[in-house]
């Protein structure tokens, strides 16, 4: 069996579409339990103050679709409207529940999205 080199992997990735790359990143994040978001550098003196502020109130929320419920088609429509995904991608997201629908959104946006998803029959969690 031939050994795959780094050059082979880079060549393969170069030929992927943006959508395929996005899906690959999401899969890698889930597989290894990491985030592709750039880490934020904080000055050592400001770290305790920033940690205290973060403990007071969370500003970014993740919308997690736990299950689609009985009205799967309605949930897919709402997921498409919220995320801008295509039909196949939205269906795959709904079929693969529990999955993150949106990440790093404001509390208002998270609550609004949860309301829309619950009204369509989905079971949703905000983290």
Curated annotation (Swiss-Prot):
Organism annotation: Geobacter metallireducens (strain ATCC 53774 / DSM 7210 / GS-15)
**What name is this protein filed under?**
Large ribosomal subunit protein bL12
A GO biological process this protein is involved in?
translation
Does the keyword Electron transport feature in the UniProt annotation?
Answer: no
Gene name in the database record: rplL
The record's listing under PANTHER family reads:
39S RIBOSOMAL PROTEIN L12, LARGE RIBOSOMAL SUBUNIT PROTEIN BL12M
Assembly: Homodimer. Part of the ribosomal stalk of the 50S ribosomal subunit. Forms a multimeric L10(L12)X complex, where L10 forms an elongated spine to which 2 to 4 L12 dimers bind in a sequential fashion. Binds GTP-bound translation factors.
Q: What CDD domains does the record point to? A: Ribosomal_L7_L12 (cd00387)
| SUPFAM superfamilies given in the database record | ClpS-like (SSF54736), Ribosomal protein L7/12, oligomerisation (N-terminal) domain (SSF48300)
- Region annotation Disordered: residue ranges? 101-127
Checking Pfam families in the record gives: Ribosomal_L12, Ribosomal_L12_N
